[in-house]
Amino acid sequence: MNKAKIIGIDGLGGSGKTTFSKILQQRLDHAKLFHLDDFIYPKSIRYDQNVSEQEAYYNKQWRYDYLIQSILKPLKNGLPINGLIEFYNKENDDYEEKQVMIPAEGMIIVEGVFLQRKELRDYFDAVIFIDVNKEDRLERVLGRDHYIGTQDEILKKYESRYFPAEDRYLEEYDPVHLADRVLSAVNSRLEREVNDVISFIENRSSSTR
């Protein structure tokens, strides 16, 4: 029985995961793209005042159980998805249901940080890690994350919340070596790296039939 292929695009903040994943989706017929940030907890949980910023981000940011039970586990077990799935709406800090249909033999791409944590890793058929140094990532987020505030406020947020949690992930999981493929996703090599990933996915799919 052919089962769905579940591809993870892992990487730290500002590494280019979303851009790469969108291009990859466009090149893969019928693949559906899910963003891990569509499955975050509301602010009251992910900004829990009883723990540090980095602890809240690392352990209280995402609804792993919901993602697993509603999407990853059924597909991994050879079942189709045909129903309403809750997606986070940042405008009202709540969830809205959307109809999702994925055939049992379909393909999905999940992009987000920390995808190789023990909660998720075994559900992926392959994980691509986008490895970009901190200086380049910081330059990107300073020019992108204006919703946080000024550049000083963005830097403060990353230094108190995101970077410490990312360092913990790197130490606990060594995602560069755990991943099936490691890419740089720089613009000059982006097309070539997308082609490389597509070939890798196709070869892996052929070998598991």
Map each language-model feature to its residues.
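Extreme N-terminal, non-catalytic leader segments
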Residues: 1-7
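Conserved lysine of the Walker
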Residues: 17
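ATP-dependent NMP and nucleoside kinases share a basic, alpha-helical "lid"
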Residues: 94-147
